Amino acid sequence: MNKKYIMAIDQGTTSTRAMIFNHRGEVVSKSQQEFSQIYPKPGWVEHSPDEIWVSILGVMSGALRSKGISPKEIAAIGITNQRETTVIWDKNTDEPVYNAIVWQCRRTTDICQELKNNGLEDKFKEKTGLVLDPYFSGTKIKWILDNVAGARQKAKNGDLLFGTIDSWLIWKLTGGKVHVTDYTNASRTLLYNIHELDWDEELLDILGIPESILPEVKASSTIYGNTVPYHFFGEEVPISGIAGDQQAATFAQGCYEKGMTKITYGTGGFMLMNTGKEAVTSDNGLLTTIAWGLDDGIYYALEGSIFNAGSAIQWLRDELDLIEDAADSEYFASKVEDTGGVYVVPAFTGLGAPYWDPRARGIIVGLTRGTNKNHLIRATIESLIYQSKDVLMAMVEDSGLDLKDIKVDGGAAANNLLLQFLSDMTGSRVERPINTETTAAGAAYLAGLAIDFWTDQEEVLKIRKVDREFNPDMSGEKREQLYRGWKKAINAALSWSKT
C-alpha cells in the first residue's frame, strides 16, 4: 500500500492530538483528547504519564479511523511535545516512579534559590543558555530522586530512566527498545551543554543526577526506531522527527534564516529568533536555546516570552465584561482610530523579558473623560504588541541581527488589527499561515525529511501557504512616539511595584 501520509503527535499541556498530513502539507485528519491536570498543592502541577500514553493510543486510532486511513499508509511519525515536563520511570517495569512534573510546576523554587545563593547562576547560564528557574527539568529530576522513596538508590543501580515527554512516548511506542531525545528537548533540561552538545558532568554532579538515567541525544530529524506492531495497529512505522513545541512551530513557519522570528500568541506569547549556527548569549534575560539539529548542523535561537497575551483578552471578557467573546475584541477596537492616549500594561503576574520584575502589577494610564470601552479594548490589544516589541528589540540588541520577517500563529493570530499593529510597530513584514497547526506541522516536516517524504527544506517552504501578509503602514515618527508612551507606562508599572 502506498505510504501517503505522515502522522504527527502533538502532546500538549492540556490535550494530546494526532494529525495526519499529506504530501502537500495539508491536515487530512485529526483527533484530540484532553487529560487530567493534577494539583497536589498550591503551585504544583502534575500529569499522569500513563494517562498521557493512553491518550496517545486514543488519538492515533481516532485520526486513522476518522478518515478511514490504514496504518499501512503512514510513512513515518513525528513527535512534538510540551517542553521541560519531566518523567522518570523504571526501565524494567515501564512504571513511572512518580507523576510527570509539568513545566508550570513551581515546587523546586527553593532548590533554584539555593543554587543561586551558592553563586551558580552564571555557570548554568553559560553552559545551558537557561536561567535557574523551576520551569526547567533539572531541578524537577533532583526533586523526584530526593523525595520518592527508593528512587535515588534505583537510579544509582541503573534501573531508572529520565525523559521529557518525547522520550517517554518513544520508549512506549518502541516497546522499551529506544531511550532517546532530540537537541531541542535536551536544551531545555538545565543539564545539557549547548556548546559542547553533551550532558554536562559538572552540572549533573551539582544536582546529584546520575548520567545513566539520561537519554541519548540525536538530531531532530532522523530515524530513532520503529513502532512495535502491538502499539501501532500491527505496523512497524519509523519514528523520525522530534522537536519541542515552540521549536517545531518555528521550523514549520520556515524561519530558516538568521533574524527570522516566530511568535505564538496563546495564553502568553512565545518568541524565537533564529540566530544561525551561533549560540548568542543574552544580556537582557532572554534564553539561548537550540532551534533544531539537522544533518548540516545545530541551529540556535534566542527565546523570550510575555506572560499575558491571550489572557489579557480573557480579562476583558471574564473580569471586565467588556466583550462576550475573545473574537469580539477586534470588532470593538476597530471602532476607534487609536487608543486616545490610553495604555494598558497587563502585568497581572509581573513582567517578563526584558524587565523581569515579578512584583510589577497591571496599570491603565492616560484615561480622560472621553475614554470609552473601545479605547480600553484597543489599548489591551496593542499592549500585546508593545510587549512583543520589547522582547524583539532585546533580541536585536543581543544578536546584532536585523529583524527579518515575523511569522505568527496561535489563537490571537486571527486578529488582523493585532497583526497590522505588530507590523507597524516593528517595521517588519508579518505573515500568518493558512495552516495554523504549526507545532504538529513542524513535527511532520521533520519526520518526513528524515525519510525523504519531502526532499529538503526548500520543498517544505514551497508547501507552506501564507493566508495573509501585513506590511508596515506607519511613519517612523509615529512609531517612536507611541513606543515612548509605552515606555512611560512600563516605568509607571515598575515604580508601582517599588512603592
From Swiss-Prot:
Sorted UniProt keywords: ATP-binding, Glycerol metabolism, Kinase, Nucleotide-binding, Transferase
Biological pathway: Polyol metabolism; glycerol degradation via glycerol kinase pathway; sn-glycerol 3-phosphate from glycerol: step 1/1
Regulation (activators, inhibitors): Activated by phosphorylation and inhibited by fructose 1,6-bisphosphate (FBP).
Entry binding sites for ADP: T13, R17, T267, G310, G411, N415
GO BP, sorted A to Z: glycerol catabolic process; glycerol metabolic process; glycerol-3-phosphate metabolic process
Record-listed ATP binding positions: T13, T14, S15, T267, G310, Q314, G411
GO function terms (MF aspect): ATP binding; glycerol kinase activity
Major enzyme class: transferase
InterPro entries the UniProt entry points to: ATPase_NBD, Carb_kinase_FGGY, Carb_kinase_FGGY_CS, FGGY_C, FGGY_N, Glycerol_kin
EC number, as in UniProt: 2.7.1.30
UniProt cross-references to Pfam families, sorted A to Z: FGGY_C, FGGY_N
Function: Key enzyme in the regulation of glycerol uptake and metabolism. Catalyzes the phosphorylation of glycerol to yield sn-glycerol 3-phosphate.
Protein name: Glycerol kinase
